[in-house]
Amino acid sequence: MSRRVDLVADLGEGYGDWAMGDDAALLEVVTSANIACGFHAGDPRIMDRTVAECVRRGVGIGAHPGFPDLVGFGRRAMDLTETEVRTDVVYQLGALSAFAAYHGARVAHVAPHGRLGNLVATRPDYARAVVDAVSHIDPGLRILAQDGELADAARAAGVVVGIVGIADRAYEDDGTLVPRSQPGAVIHDAGEIAERTVRMVTEGVIDSRNGVAIPVAVDTVLLHGDTPAAVELARRIRAELESAGVVIAAPTALDVEARR
């Protein structure tokens, strides 16, 4: 199983004067960031500041495109056409790429947010749209995904995939996430989350909510910055992974090219 993982958090998910989570503290722990691109959260000032901080701290920059749903934080399903999904992703990735270029950096990966992130695992049309956008803008980008339609479509197009394990979410028996609308979808016990994460990385297994052992091969662990005690949890997960002999590091460009 993976002995090296990229520790990623969703950042820049505020709007105007409103901020969600302690991004500065999380940036001391994580190795990469999924940065909101203005549709579900984020705005030009927040994107600019977040990219600048990632560059200053050596944290990998990732685009976190979502549905155009500020009110619902991108967590509500939207029935869009394939073209609409593609153009929305192109728009958001283009915006973040411009901020990265301004600060002398580049976007390294793309990780769909929220309900879009769930649907691309099961809807081939949405998966194709994301891969089409990414492969035309920069085929050297990684796509972060769970096993499913998006991962399959990316591999078929020659785009490198980072398989994501989500530390604080419950899984169904088929390996998909339990919808947030259902009880128990989000796990809050820090000890349980840390234990599940270490097992996921070192043994390649995560237990579903029904106790089914699901095989996984993650090289990326996602932490949500909008949960209570997110910073303390991130520190604990990193410490326990390192105690288990896991190297915490973002992939380099050479790493990505070697997997192509």
Which residue ranges define each predicted feature?
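Acidic (Asp/Glu)-rich catalytic clusters
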Residues: 24-28, 49-62, 101-104
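Glycine-enriched alpha-helix->loop->beta-strand junction motifs that scaffold or abut catalytic
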Residues: 29-32, 55, 136, 140, ...
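C-terminal alpha-helical cap/extension of soluble enzyme domains
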Residues: 180-260
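Glycine/small-residue-rich loop that forms an oxyanion/phosphate-binding "nest" at active or ligand-binding sites
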Residues: 69-112
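Glycine-rich tight-turn/loop motif centered on a GG-T
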Residues: 19, 23, 33-40, 71-86, ...
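Active-site rim beta-loop-alpha module in soluble metabolic enzymes
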Residues: 148-205
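Charged helix-capping and loop-helix junction motifs
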Residues: 123-129
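Conserved, mostly hydrophobic/aromatic
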Residues: 10, 64, 110, 223
